[in-house]
Regions:
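Small-aliphatic-rich amphipathic alpha-helix that forms the alpha element of a beta-alpha
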Residues: 59-82, 99-110, 194, 198, ...
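Glycine-rich anion-binding loops of enzyme active sites
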Residues: 33, 39, 46, 79-169, ...
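General beta-strand structural signal in soluble alpha/beta enzymes
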Residues: 21-24, 40-42, 114-118, 153-156, ...
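Glycine-/charge-enriched secondary-structure boundary and capping motifs
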Residues: 1-14, 57, 90-114, 121-125, ...
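Residue-level signal for inorganic ion chemistry
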Residues: 30, 69, 77, 115, ...
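Extreme N-terminal cap/leader segments of soluble proteins
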Residues: 1-60, 76, 81, 85, ...
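Internal active-site segments that recognize and position negatively charged phosphoryl groups
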Residues: 151-156, 188-213, 217
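A short, charged helix-loop
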Residues: 171-190, 243
Length: 323
């Protein structure tokens, strides 16, 4: 017997919702927002051969589909609550959907997210997730809050996902252990939700690094009307990537590689100790990489300093979906 859309939904995506008035099973969901909170909404689409390999592990893909959306809420300092999922599938493959749902729902349970609706249809493999969360009114972290004099910080390590992709496309050769370490960041990224929550009231601005450090930091600078300077030697790299810093492709991954899903944020200098404690409390490495400054005529909006103090020319980097 052919598996129907309703069979797939009922079998793999129906679960008891904790934060929902009415969830999966009706024409629409009903949710109730906490008093004094604002609703935070984001959505991301993942397309086969554009954002992931067609033969990608479905369980890892389920994890990643939700993780990249959780990362958006992390950058806003929001608590995740609800998600919707729309899937286009070439065929109703119950085994594939079962594995995908395992990855998706395991991460949803970890962050107490209710799946409250969605859709399935036949077509080229395409995944669209909408994520919703809550933040106390007026407390959301935003891109437009960076101020001259702020420190610039990033979480975790940068470049692993882009480095893994380069290796999988045979642009660089890595040892098996190095590839495993970097590929884990590509296929199953970690959303820094707890760090985002810890930064509320400390950070002036934040963004998640999905399209590369240079590209995403530029979004903050434009939105805030400021400039910045970062120290090349301060950028945090994993042990695997650090062993290849004699290669240009490693620096490209650090500065412009996508799929990091770390947080880049600015905070006042006076908050340095509190930022460090916040990172320790949620067990996330945080690294100060530079500073925010006022815009000066004749000076680039973003300066990158080499270890010898020389200013490096920054070309447009990062990932552009329409490039």
């Amino acid at each position: 017997m052919a598996t129907s859309e309703f069979d797939l939904i009922a079998r793999y995506f129906t679960h008891r919702a904790r934060h929902t008035v009415l969830g999966v099973g009706d024409d629409a969901a009903l949710v109730r927002i906490k008093r004094g909170h604002e609703l935070v909404i984001s959505a991301d689409m993942l397309v086969a051969s554009r954002h992931f390999f067609r033969d990608a592990n479905p369980r890892q893909l389920g994890h990643k589909a939700l993780a990249v959306n959780l990362s958006d809420l992390a950058a806003m300092g929001a608590t995740p609550r609800w998600a919707t999922l729309a899937l286009a599938l070439p065929q109703a493959d119950a085994r594939w959907v079962s594995e995908f749902s395992r990855g998706f729902m395991a991460l949803a349970r970890r962050f107490d997210v209710d799946l409250i609706g969605g859709d399935t249809t036949r077509g080229p493999l395409n995944i669209c997730v909408q994520i919703m969360g809550e933040v106390p009114r007026g407390k959301a972290l935003r891109r437009d809050g960076a101020r001259a004099g702020d420190d610039l910080w990033v979480s975790g390590a940068l470049g692993d996902a882009a480095f893994a992709l380069a290796a999988l496309k045979r642009r660089i050769r890595l040892k098996p252990a190095e590839l495993r370490q970097c590929a884990a960041r590509l296929h199953a990224p970690t959303a820094r939700v707890n760090l985002g929550l810890a930064l509320r009231g400390l950070a002036h601005s934040a963004i998640d690094i999905s399209d590369g450090l240079l590209a995403d930091l530029d979004h903050v600078l434009v939105a805030s009307g400021v400039a910045a300077e970062i120290e090349l030697a301060a950028l945090p790299a994993s042990p695997a990537l650090s062993r290849h810093l004699d290669k240009a492709i490693a620096w490209s991954a650090l500065l412009a590689g996508g799929d990091d899903y770390e947080l880049c944020f600015s905070a006042p200098r006076a908050a340095r100790e509190r930022i460090a404690r916040a990172g320790s409390r949620v067990r996330v490495r945080v690294t100060r990489i530079g500073s925010v400054r006022a815009v000066r005529k004749g000076t680039p909006r973003l300066l990158v300093r080499a270890p010898d103090g020389a200013a490096l020319r920054v070309v447009r980097g990062g990932y552009d979906h329409f490039a």
